[in-house]
């Protein structure tokens, strides 16, 4: 699935995000305009990883601002058996959200 945003979603995502103008231009080109990341790597002389990171920063900001109501994002370091359970909960929650759409 290609990650895409509308211009208004993009503007909401970058609101308050501390990134440079180049990052914003790259992310808009990829997420809003649908241009391939390779285009920016070539034209700006950047590595693919740098371009991917720019896009990821904006996408992650969008996801953080658009969690379903009643949901929270968590990061934790757990023993493997507990991490397995949490991953299972995450998969179940994703399925539940997909059926609501």
Swiss-Prot record:
GO molecular function ontology, one term from the record: DNA binding
DNA-binding region positions on the chain: 37-56
Keyword Transcription: yes
Gene3D superfamilies found in the cross-reference section: 1.10.10.2690
Family annotation (InterPro entries): Fimbrial_Adhesin_Reg (IPR053721), TrfB (IPR032428)
Keyword DNA-binding belongs to the record: yes
Keyword annotations from UniProtKB, A to Z: DNA-binding, Plasmid, Repressor, Transcription, Transcription regulation
Pfam families the UniProt entry points to: KORA
Cited function: In conjunction with KorB, inhibits the transcription of kilA, trfA and korAB operons. In conjunction with KorC is responsible for the negative control of kilC and kilE operons.
Protein name: TrfB transcriptional repressor protein
Species this protein is from: Escherichia coli
């Amino acid at each position: 699935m290609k990650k895409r945003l509308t211009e208004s979603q993009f503007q909401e995502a970058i609101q308050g995000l501390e990134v440079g103008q180049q990052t914003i231009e790259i992310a808009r080109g990829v997420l809003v305009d649908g241009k391939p990341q390779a285009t920016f790597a070539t034209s700006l002389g950047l590595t693919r990883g740098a371009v991917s990171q720019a896009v990821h920063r904006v996408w992650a900001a969008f996801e953080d601002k658009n969690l379903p109501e009643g949901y929270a994002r968590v990061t934790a370091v757990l023993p493997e058996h507990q991490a397995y359970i949490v991953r299972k909960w995450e998969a179940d929650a994703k399925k539940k959200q997909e059926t609501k759409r």
